[in-house]
Amino acid sequence: GAAGTAIIKLLNLYGAAHIIAVDSRGAIGTHRSDLNSEKTVLLQYLNTDQAGSLEDTLVDADIFIGVSRAGLLTPELVQTMATNPIIFALANPVPEIMPAAAKQAGAAVIATGRSDFPNQVNNSLAFPGIFRGALDHHVQKITDQHKLAAAEALAQLVAHPTADMVIPSPFDSRVVAAVAQVIR
């Protein structure tokens, strides 16, 4: 979907070295003849052409970022990942795996889209500041560089990251100003 595509594009632009995208039929790559135009666009951002299922692609993976459906990621799959994996289970209202289950399976950092768990990843972290910055600085088009700068500004608000605080809360009073400042 649109969220997954945007995440992949920005991770690639930021320099992520090994991105694998997976849909209901498995890893997306040039080996697939069933890709629609939206999925074909992803090929330019993927650093690999790994084939296989979600299960195959998770073996020894460091990070899982999901924007799909509740329950997709099981504790057993987390246990096949690298030691201390990072899990961003962003499906709403129910994430791909619940934080307690991910942690029990060995995840070091867990983020969801929900405000009732630590590390809420939500567009409310970025949009108010992006719009404030665009208005204040007369920016007519939000670019990928603006999005990366906003992500960096958010990250800098957490001076001493912990497993339960890798990103500020959307309710942190500094968020809007920090993001707005970098939209120029």
Predicted features and spans:
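Glycine-rich phosphate/diphosphate-binding loop of Rossmann-like nucleotide-binding domains
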Residues: 1-66
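Short glycine/serine/threonine-rich phosphate/pyrophosphate-binding segments
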Residues: 1-9, 29-30, 71-76, 95-97, ...
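Adenosine-phosphate binding glycine-rich loop
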Residues: 89-184
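Rossmann-like adenosine-cofactor binding region
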Residues: 40-108, 115-116
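A sequence-level detector of short, solvent-exposed, charge-rich linear segments
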Residues: 22, 38, 76-77, 83, ...
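Alpha-helical scaffold segments in soluble metabolic enzymes
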Residues: 6-10, 56, 60-63, 76, ...
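Hydrophobic alpha-helical scaffolding
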Residues: 1, 10, 44-54, 63, ...
